[in-house]
Amino acid sequence: MNLKDYIATIENYPKEGVTFRDISPLMADGNAYSYAVREIVQYATDKKIDMVVGPEARGFIVGCPVAFELGIGFAPVRKPGKLPREVISADYEKEYGVDTLTMHADAIKPGQRVLIVDDLLATGGTVKATIEMIERLGGIVAGCAFLIELDELKGREVIGEYDYKVLMHY
């Protein structure tokens, strides 16, 4: 199945000069959505994953069904002020400044093998901050999986030695 057939391309969104890749059509098609989830589950199967972690918001959309299929838990990564209990945080660079991500301080137990799942790998800032928090909690990042990678933004360089899978390249 060619998953790119289920990605809408919107020029100049959310601002002039940006090409937005919208995964909504993929999610709206049960066969395509299921296929994408199964591809990530297959990647994760041999990695002995204990927990899936996904950054808001689209990391939830992809990560939760992966965790469900693997029969394991899911831990959300959110912006500050969105999680009700004690959190840890990590800053990351954005185009026009610094932003912060958080996760519950008890989300990952030391030694747990974690799969990070998100819809998009662009500059790598989100995944870098997520890796930092997982490792601070004693987790092992066993892999990362993305629906889409925007190759020209070089996010793979940020991932470095971590294993990862991408379903579509743009």
Curated annotation (Swiss-Prot):
Q: Which GO terms describe its molecular function?
A: adenine binding; adenine phosphoribosyltransferase activity; AMP binding
Single GO BP term:
purine ribonucleoside salvage
Main subcellular location: cytoplasm
Which reactions is this enzyme annotated as catalysing? AMP + diphosphate = 5-phospho-alpha-D-ribose 1-diphosphate + adenine
Going by the UniProt record, its keywords in alphabetical order are: Cytoplasm, Glycosyltransferase, Purine salvage, Transferase
- Cell compartments where the protein resides: Cytoplasm
Quote the pathway field. Answer: Purine metabolism; AMP biosynthesis via salvage pathway; AMP from adenine: step 1/1
Would you say which domain of life the source belongs to? Bacteria
Mention any one GO cellular component term assigned to this protein in its UniProt record. Answer: cytoplasm
Enzyme Commission code:
2.4.2.7
**Recorded family membership:** Belongs to the purine/pyrimidine phosphoribosyltransferase family.
Quaternary structure note = Homodimer.
Sum up the protein's function in the record's words: Catalyzes a salvage reaction resulting in the formation of AMP, that is energically less costly than de novo synthesis.
Q: Which HAMAP family match?
A: Aden_phosphoribosyltr
- Identify this protein by name: Adenine phosphoribosyltransferase
Q: Which organism is it from?
A: Streptococcus gordonii (strain Challis / ATCC 35105 / BCRC 15272 / CH1 / DL1 / V288)
Q: What is the lineage of its organism?
A: Bacteria, Bacillati, Bacillota, Bacilli, Lactobacillales
